[in-house]
UniProtKB/Swiss-Prot annotation:
Lineage, uppermost ranks: Eukaryota, Fungi, Dikarya, Basidiomycota, Agaricomycotina
Coiled coil: none
Catalyzed chemical reaction(s): ATP + H2O = ADP + phosphate + H(+)
Name used for this protein in its record: ATP-dependent RNA helicase DBP7
Compositionally biased residues, Polar residues: 50-62, 77-89
Source organism per UniProt: Cryptococcus neoformans var. neoformans serotype D (strain JEC21 / ATCC MYA-565)
Amino acid sequence: MADDIELNFAVPASGLVRQVAPKKGGRWTDRVRAKREARDAFKSMKANHLTVQNPSMPTVSASELVPKPAVIKPAPTSASVSRHPQPKSQVVAPPRFTNATAGPSRPAPSPQAASSNVPKSASIPAPATIKHRTSLPTNAFERPPLPPQAGPSRPHPAEKLKTPQFISSLFTSAPLPGVKSSVAPEISTGAPSNAPVDTTTFQGLGLNKLLINHLKGKMGVEKPTGIQRNCLPYMLSSPLNPDKKAGDEGPKEEPLRDVLIQAQTGSGKTLSYLLPIVQTLLPLSRLSYIDRSIGTLAIILAPTRELAQQISKVLEQLLHMSFAASKEGSDDEDEDDRPFTRWLVSGLLTGGSTRTHEKAKLRKGVPILVSTPGRLLDHLQNTMSFQCAKTMFLVLDEADRLMDLGFEETIQGIIKALEGRRRNEINIEKEMDKEGGGTMRWPFWDRGRLNVLCSATVDAKVERLAGAALRDPVLFRSEKDEAEAKKKAEGKDDAVIKALNEAQAIVIPQESEEKFTPPSQLSQKYVVLPTKLRLVALVALLRSLISSVAKGISVSNGTKVIVFLSSTDAVDFHWKLLGGVQMGQQGQQADGEKEEDEEEEGESVEERESDGESKAKKSKRKAKSKSTDDIVSLASPLFPNTTLHRLHGSLPLRTRLASLKAFATSSSQPSVLFATSVASRGLDLPLVRAVVQYDLPTEGGANEYVHRVGRTARAGKGGEAWAFVSPSEEGWVKWIEGKMGAAEGKSGVNLGQVGVEDVLRKGFGGKSYEYEARATDVQLSFENWVLASEQNAALARKAFASFVRAYSTHPLEEKQFFHTKLLHLGHLAKSFALREAPAQLASALSAGKSKRPKSKAASSATHPGKRKRDEDEDEMEERGGKELTARNETERRMYEAVRKQGRTIKSGGKLGEFSGKGQNKGQKAAATGGEFHIVNTGELERLVARRK
């Protein structure tokens, strides 16, 4: 038969028998049920067979006895399939049901053969061995060929019946799990983490509500500046967890990268690092076991004492915030209810103060410390009670000034000392843990120390310091945000500018391409004037600036003026000159001097000192010099209702601080400050309307110029900057304009020229050329003041010489504008109110140097037998004794009386050594009653009687 022929057999209904699938495995109940079904099927098949042989018996259909099999999709038929007739007397066995892909199975043998093979005494076999077949003729059909995909005739184990399915109830008698606590907590939603950040407010930047309310209510700061919008989100992104314990398992906290802040002067750099410090340490105030004894956690370094004191004042204002506002203004019910403790205090360490007092502060603990580099390194090396191992912040403010003053090695020593103390403290904690504890472990060692470097300019020196002190720093600049805001306002997006900004945000500009950017609202002007008109032009300019303030014009921009000079001698001279001159009273001053001379002539020779100066005049001069050093401010008839102040590095610390405080105090009355470059860095002096650069900067070039003019036009307010330029220095204007500007596409900075005649006319007033006569009168008054006293003349000569020395220190790049050969020394002497020729000034200065006392080395060489104590007493005698160091007039008079009493029994001016030639020490003691015995007490008795 051909291979493509497939046979189909018709099975009569009477011969239909269900084939029971073999049962393997399973439960014992299933096996019993299978045996029972097999026995019933065998009985039914036997009954059907008997019915076929005896037709008279009633016919019972097999379908009524055996359950119907599952519906199987019939195999496809072909037209060429041959059908074979079935004999009526025979029963055709049903085909075996296999999978859909299998072909027809072999015909089963007859029931008789199947039954004959089973012994009568044997039990019914298992379902797996039972096979129901019906007898068919061997020649009834031929087996068709199997298709290629046909499987085996026996059922595969994978073809077992499907797993029985069960439908169960959702709820049973078992109780459902409940909440452990009796009261279910309310689930609160946190702040949105993917919401846009509002950088225009402190709240949007993530600042604490306590600090926001304090800034707005007490300090008048409502919105952040550009540099604060840039750096605050990053520096506030890693708050402290006060509940963290040492040794807690969890993800290790990665420390923040160090920060480099570059922004203009007056842009808010101080608050940019003070706010993150205070907010980071504030959560520790909720812990009752944290107090000042924890040590120093933040250190701020400033280059000068004045800047350090200013930072300390701002920090104290921040730390005086009210903690009561936290619960009143808080809407978060889950906020920590633990109260705050006031353990955050600030401390100030500067040179010139008493180290003993500073050690007492450090022993108690100063969490936030403001210091100058030298004094901090001194305490790190010598003060064992200084606990700074846990320092979390180190701020270097005005880094460019720190490098200019030569603090690079000092800063490196500070960093090494901090690292050493940190390692020692960690090792001590480890040793204590091995021994069984005993100390509180610090849980924030893994945070490390965040180093912050602030500077208005970034040059090669600052880059070197950043490389040594910072670790993978992040640079923040305010100009980038301003450029982006301007670009958004114009609706432009330049890919070139964007790429330039991104490059500048990463790469620090080199010194040769650096641009120094002053505030854009600053009005910069310069005056080209002859050298001999400098002094009267300064007076005229100050009068015009002060008069506008007195009339109520531009009061909002400030009522104060700063005048920068090149030397400390020039500051002292101009301050005393403008404060001491008396217009129209020169004759009275001359008469007073004549009377003093007549009194001096009437004195006897015995009352004169060895140098020819009378004792009364000398003591009067000493008292006058003492009182002059204590004076903080002066008044001048040239500037009505105006106070004059001075500031330079050679002043005593107490005088410097008092002068700076008096000038910085807000007042409706105008004031003028004469200062050196010590006032050009970091000082936030409020209400400064104008800056006058009477002497152009000698060191620093454009950098120093920008820092000087940055004392005004701060925090968005207006201001003026004036520069005095001689005709030979006029090329400096174009040079400084080229040095200033912005590297991000802004237009350059231009200095506007103002005529000297306009300045004089506006300052002195009058019609036509009347200002010339008034300026001449002022110049003559200055010259008469210099001639009135030798001390004033010496002060003017020293200021003149200091100006020439400072003028010669301009860098090589500026020598084309500033050279001593270009100076007219005669006109320059006129600007210092001197009538002497420059040659005579040089001889007078050399004569003054020759009159100076011998140094200690020379004295020791001359008198090798002198003790150090004797030399110190000689030096004290030459300086005027203890009278100059007296705290009040009574103490000074007491010192003077004791010294006068000692002269009667002294030898060589030393009290306690008695004269007497040819006598040994024992004879002297016997004759005088003992060493240090006062022979006559009349002077002391007269002094006490006069006081009564």
